[in-house]
Swiss-Prot record:
Stretches that traverse the bilayer: 79-94, 95-112, 132-148, 149-165
Protein name, as recorded: Prenylated Rab acceptor protein 1
Region named Required for interaction with prenylated RAB3A and VAMP2: 30-54, 175-185
Species this chain originates from: Homo sapiens (Human)
Key word Transmembrane present: yes
Tissues expressing the protein: Ubiquitous. Strongest expression found in placenta, pituitary gland, kidney, lung and stomach.
UniProt function note: General Rab protein regulator required for vesicle formation from the Golgi complex. May control vesicle docking and fusion by mediating the action of Rab GTPases to the SNARE complexes. In addition it inhibits the removal of Rab GTPases from the membrane by GDI.
Region (Required for interaction with GDI1): 165-185
GO cellular component, one term: plasma membrane
Family: Belongs to the PRA1 family.
Amino-acid biosynthesis among keywords: no
Pfam families hit by this protein: PRA1
Subunit architecture: Homodimer. Interacts with VAMP2 (synaptobrevin-2), GDI1, and PCLO. Interacts specifically with prenylated Rab proteins; strongly with RAB4B, RAB5A and RAB5C, and weakly with RAB4A, RAB6, RAB7A, RAB17 and RAB22. Interacts with NDRG1.
Length: 185
């Protein structure tokens, strides 16, 4: 029991929570709970990418039904596909990586300064929200030069194409308790 607590303390010291393996940078609260729910409801990747389950829908009604049901069923998987596309976009754009480093570096410096003492400019105490807005203002030219706007729209477009294609062409999972649909004769 003591060894298990020591391992958990070591993991927390490394920046990971022993129970969830989520980074400590994600504050506890609604964001962490949402991410934990997504991880808990993720569907098996083997069924998500099974090529034998892809087929062309017969008609528009089946296409719409597939879209709705697959987006609902694979919602957590689609969130991680979206996060993967964001990661791919950031890693393949060195200038965007530099802009993000400048922004997060400025935020980290401001965070360390607020731990030491309050920031005072022209005799007035500057709130943390204004400090982070200043960091964003300083980083804005870097984001503009890196083409962050086009990167955002690329990620959104790629996400819609990938998720829309998967949801439209992946056959619907059989759900327990689903009513049998009878065709009119």
């Amino acid at each position: 029991m003591a060894a298990q607590k020591d391992q958990q303390k070591d993991a927390e010291a490394e920046g990971l929570s022993g129970t969830t393996l989520l980074p400590k940078l994600i504050p506890s609260g609604a964001g962490r709970e949402w991410l934990e729910r997504r991880r808990a409801t993720i569907r098996p990747w083997s069924t998500f990418v099974d090529q034998q389950r892809f087929s062309r829908p017969r008609n528009l009604g089946e296409l719409c039904q597939r879209l709705v049901r697959n987006v609902e069923y694979y919602q957590s998987n689609y969130v991680f596909v979206f996060l993967g596309l964001i990661l791919y976009c950031v890693v393949t754009s060195p200038m965007l990586l530099v802009a993000l480093a400048v922004f997060f570096g400025a935020c980290y410096i401001l965070y360390l300064r607020t731990l030491e003492s309050k920031l005072v400019l022209f005799g007035r105490e500057v709130s943390p929200a204004h400090q982070y807005a200043l960091a964003g203002g300083i980083s804005f030219p870097f984001f503009w030069l890196a083409g962050a706007g086009s990167a955002v729209f690329w990620v959104l477009g790629a996400t819609l194409v990938v998720i829309g294609s998967h949801a439209a062409f992946h056959q619907i999972e059989a759900v327990d308790g689903e009513e049998l649909q009878m065709e009119p004769v």
